[in-house]
């Protein structure tokens, strides 16, 4: 039997960092669904495709999603898909129902026959809805903005940038939670964790405790 852990949450809630650490500790395969949308966006960008054209050729595309890498035509694109230009395209196409439908199928296929930790915004509700363990990580938008600022290497004293990030996150939350296709929401059987006042290590400790209890590790 294969074990599945689904971790969802809004942008900058810490889900990817926590998911990756849990997978490392449990020796599970780790995958962030965001990588797939970014890979889609990259292919569209380099080939100058709109969504309709992309959907016509998507099943002919040669790509591979591995534990820590993404390949397109056997070239490692893991780093290039992290650029802001790719991220901007990814956020736009991620709301398209047809894109999401294909992504879900590919993510479910990726999860077959392995122990996996997957994070995203619809993992526990759609992609791995039968996962044995689900978490929904959340945090106050101000805290998430501060974390994003720190990740960018910008001082927390930069109030102008902080306010901009707060607004960006609020807008992203609205888009994610109100889209018609697979909106961001907590799965009924997910464990809710507000990480606003918790350290990274504390969140990892709590999630690992639950995992070891459920999987009897």
From Swiss-Prot:
UniProt-listed Enzyme Commission number(s): 2.7.4.25
Q: Which CDD domains match?
A: CMPK
Q: Name one GO biological process term.
A: pyrimidine nucleotide metabolic process
Q: Name one GO molecular function term.
A: (d)CMP kinase activity
Classification via Pfam families:
Cytidylate_kin (PF02224)
Q: Which UniProt keywords are given for this protein, alphabetically ordered?
A: ATP-binding, Cytoplasm, Kinase, Nucleotide-binding, Transferase
Main localization of the protein? Answer: cytoplasm
Q: Output the InterPro entries linked to this UniProt entry.
A: Cytidylate_kin, Cytidylate_kinase_dom, P-loop_NTPase
- Report the subcellular localization: Cytoplasm
Q: Which reaction does it catalyse?
A: CMP + ATP = CDP + ADP; dCMP + ATP = dCDP + ADP
Q: Give the source's domain of life in one word.
A: Bacteria
In which residues is ATP bound? Answer: 9-17
Task: Output the Gene3D superfamilies linked to this UniProt entry.
Answer: P-loop containing nucleotide triphosphate hydrolases (3.40.50.300)
Which cellular components does GO assign to this protein? Answer: cytosol
Q: HAMAP family this protein is in?
A: Cytidyl_kinase_type1 (MF_00238)
The family annotation for this protein states: Belongs to the cytidylate kinase family. Type 1 subfamily.
| UniProt name for this protein | Cytidylate kinase
Species annotation: Mycoplasma genitalium (strain ATCC 33530 / DSM 19775 / NCTC 10195 / G37)
